[in-house]
């Protein structure tokens, strides 16, 4: 049994290119930290402002999701105009629990019921 996290940075289009690059770098660093913290965790950024994660310990999924949300909510773009617009928003998150057919970092592939569930739930938010 696996847990997956699907997330979308809300209002990312209001960020400047430099601010979006900075946010992506912070998210990548956070995902690396989560990999060290939770055995069996793998996360990636897709489509520029979306996040997909899988972990083999569903009990830790909510905590990992809150860490990601906290990172995005605490992000302060250096551009004041970006900051005013962006601070109203954050991260939409959905967690799916289920089986996974494929988890392959080398192919950058996640496939299975859990990722479908979190993806569908996110699209309904």
What do the predicted segments below correspond to?
Residues 1-125:
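Regulatory and interdomain segments flanking nucleotide-handling catalytic cores
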């Amino acid at each position: 049994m696996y847990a997956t996290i699907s997330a979308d940075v809300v209002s990312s289009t209001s960020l400047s290119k430099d601010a979006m690059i900075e946010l992506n770098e912070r998210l990548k660093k956070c995902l690396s930290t989560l990999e060290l913290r939770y055995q069996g965790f793998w996360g990636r950024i897709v489509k520029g402002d979306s996040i997909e994660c899988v972990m083999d310990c569903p009990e830790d999924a909510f905590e990992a999701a809150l860490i990601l949300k906290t990172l995005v909510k605490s992000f302060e773009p250096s551009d004041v105009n970006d900051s005013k617009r962006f601070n109203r928003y954050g991260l939409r998150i959905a967690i799916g629990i289920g089986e996974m057919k494929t988890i392959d970092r080398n192919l950058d592939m996640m496939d299975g019921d859990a990722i479908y569930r979190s993806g569908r739930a996110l699209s309904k938010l």
